[in-house]
Protein backbone atom coordinates (compact mmCIF):
# COMPACT_ATOMS: atom_id res chain seq x y z
CA UNK A 1 0.00 0.00 0.00
CA UNK A 2 1.30 3.43 -0.83
CA UNK A 3 2.06 5.98 1.85
CA UNK A 4 -0.72 8.35 0.84
CA UNK A 5 -3.34 5.60 0.97
CA UNK A 6 -2.27 4.53 4.43
CA UNK A 7 -2.31 8.09 5.73
CA UNK A 8 -5.71 8.82 4.20
CA UNK A 9 -7.14 5.63 5.71
CA UNK A 10 -5.64 6.51 9.08
CA UNK A 11 -7.02 10.05 8.92
CA UNK A 12 -10.42 8.66 7.95
CA UNK A 13 -10.45 6.26 10.91
CA UNK A 14 -9.29 9.01 13.25
CA UNK A 15 -11.98 11.39 11.99
CA UNK A 16 -14.71 8.78 12.43
CA UNK A 17 -13.48 8.12 15.96
CA UNK A 18 -13.39 11.81 16.92
CA UNK A 19 -16.84 12.39 15.41
CA UNK A 20 -18.19 9.41 17.31
CA UNK A 21 -16.70 10.61 20.60
CA UNK A 22 -18.14 14.08 20.16
CA UNK A 23 -21.64 13.01 19.15
CA UNK A 24 -22.01 9.78 21.11
CA UNK A 25 -24.36 9.62 24.06
CA UNK A 26 -23.81 5.94 24.76
CA UNK A 27 -20.76 4.80 26.74
CA UNK A 28 -20.27 1.61 24.73
CA UNK A 29 -20.26 3.57 21.48
CA UNK A 30 -17.76 6.02 22.97
CA UNK A 31 -15.45 3.12 23.89
CA UNK A 32 -15.69 1.78 20.34
CA UNK A 33 -14.82 5.20 18.93
CA UNK A 34 -11.84 5.40 21.27
CA UNK A 35 -10.65 2.06 19.87
CA UNK A 36 -10.92 3.48 16.35
CA UNK A 37 -8.76 6.44 17.36
CA UNK A 38 -6.13 4.17 18.89
CA UNK A 39 -6.05 2.00 15.75
CA UNK A 40 -5.59 5.08 13.56
CA UNK A 41 -2.67 6.18 15.74
CA UNK A 42 -1.15 2.70 15.44
CA UNK A 43 -1.41 2.86 11.66
CA UNK A 44 0.42 6.20 11.67
CA UNK A 45 3.14 4.89 13.97
CA UNK A 46 3.83 1.87 11.78
CA UNK A 47 3.62 3.88 8.54
CA UNK A 48 6.03 6.59 9.62
CA UNK A 49 8.36 4.09 11.26
CA UNK A 50 8.62 2.24 7.96
CA UNK A 51 8.99 5.47 5.99
CA UNK A 52 11.78 7.09 7.97
CA UNK A 53 13.88 4.11 9.00
CA UNK A 54 12.75 0.64 8.05
CA UNK A 55 15.68 -1.01 9.86
CA UNK A 56 14.70 0.24 13.31
CA UNK A 57 11.48 -0.93 14.88
CA UNK A 58 10.79 1.94 17.27
CA UNK A 59 7.38 2.76 15.82
CA UNK A 60 6.40 -0.90 15.66
CA UNK A 61 7.39 -1.51 19.27
CA UNK A 62 5.55 1.60 20.43
CA UNK A 63 2.55 0.41 18.44
CA UNK A 64 2.61 -2.89 20.36
CA UNK A 65 2.51 -0.93 23.64
CA UNK A 66 -0.49 1.04 22.38
CA UNK A 67 -2.21 -2.23 21.41
CA UNK A 68 -1.59 -3.56 24.93
CA UNK A 69 -3.11 -0.42 26.44
CA UNK A 70 -6.09 -0.73 24.09
CA UNK A 71 -6.54 -4.36 25.14
CA UNK A 72 -6.58 -3.34 28.79
CA UNK A 73 -9.09 -0.61 27.99
CA UNK A 74 -11.21 -3.12 26.06
CA UNK A 75 -11.22 -5.42 29.09
CA UNK A 76 -11.81 -2.83 31.81
CA UNK A 77 -14.10 -0.44 29.92
CA UNK A 78 -17.10 -2.76 29.51
CA UNK A 79 -16.80 -3.84 33.14
CA UNK A 80 -17.02 -0.21 34.24
CA UNK A 81 -19.94 0.40 31.89
CA UNK A 82 -21.83 -2.65 33.20
CA UNK A 83 -21.22 -1.51 36.78
CA UNK A 84 -22.59 1.94 35.96
CA UNK A 85 -25.57 0.32 34.24
CA UNK A 86 -26.28 -1.81 37.31
CA UNK A 87 -26.28 1.25 39.55
CA UNK A 88 -27.91 3.84 37.27
CA UNK A 89 -29.96 1.67 34.84
CA UNK A 90 -28.60 3.69 31.93
CA UNK A 91 -25.48 3.82 29.78
CA UNK A 92 -26.11 7.33 28.52
CA UNK A 93 -23.19 9.65 29.15
CA UNK A 94 -25.27 12.72 29.96
CA UNK A 95 -27.29 10.81 32.60
CA UNK A 96 -24.35 9.30 34.46
CA UNK A 97 -22.90 12.14 36.48
CA UNK A 98 -21.00 10.12 39.07
CA UNK A 99 -20.02 13.13 41.18
CA UNK A 100 -23.55 13.78 42.43
CA UNK A 101 -24.04 10.60 44.41
Swiss-Prot record:
Residue intervals passing through the bilayer: 2-22, 32-52, 61-81
One GO MF term: oxidoreductase activity, acting on NAD(P)H, quinone or similar compound as acceptor
Any single GO BP term: photosynthesis, light reaction
EC number of the protein: 7.1.1.-
Gene3D superfamilies, per database record: 1.10.287.3510
Catalyses which reaction(s): a plastoquinone + NADH + (n+1) H(+)(in) = a plastoquinol + NAD(+) + n H(+)(out); a plastoquinone + NADPH + (n+1) H(+)(in) = a plastoquinol + NADP(+) + n H(+)(out)
UniProt KW keywords: Chloroplast, Membrane, NAD, NADP, Plastid, Plastoquinone, Quinone, Thylakoid, Translocase, Transmembrane, Transmembrane helix, Transport
Keyword Metal-binding: no
Membrane topology recorded in Swiss-Prot or TrEMBL: Multi-pass membrane protein
Pfam families linked: Oxidored_q2
Cellular component annotations (GO), alphabetically ordered: chloroplast thylakoid membrane; NADH dehydrogenase complex
InterPro entries recorded: NADH_UbQ_OxRdtase_chain4L/K, NUOK/Mnh_C1-like
Cellular location(s): Plastid, Chloroplast thylakoid membrane
Role this protein plays: NDH shuttles electrons from NAD(P)H:plastoquinone, via FMN and iron-sulfur (Fe-S) centers, to quinones in the photosynthetic chain and possibly in a chloroplast respiratory chain. The immediate electron acceptor for the enzyme in this species is believed to be plastoquinone. Couples the redox reaction to proton translocation, and thus conserves the redox energy in a proton gradient.
Similarity-based family: Belongs to the complex I subunit 4L family.
Oligomer status and interactors: NDH is composed of at least 16 different subunits, 5 of which are encoded in the nucleus.
PANTHER family the record matches: NADH-UBIQUINONE OXIDOREDUCTASE CHAIN 4L, NADH-UBIQUINONE OXIDOREDUCTASE SUBUNIT ND4L
Name of protein: NAD(P)H-quinone oxidoreductase subunit 4L, chloroplastic
Source organism (scientific name): Ceratophyllum demersum
Species classification: Eukaryota, Viridiplantae, Streptophyta, Embryophyta, Tracheophyta
Amino acid sequence: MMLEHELVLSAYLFSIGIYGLITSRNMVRALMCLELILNAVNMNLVTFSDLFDSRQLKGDIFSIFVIAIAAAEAAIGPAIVSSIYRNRRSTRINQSNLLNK
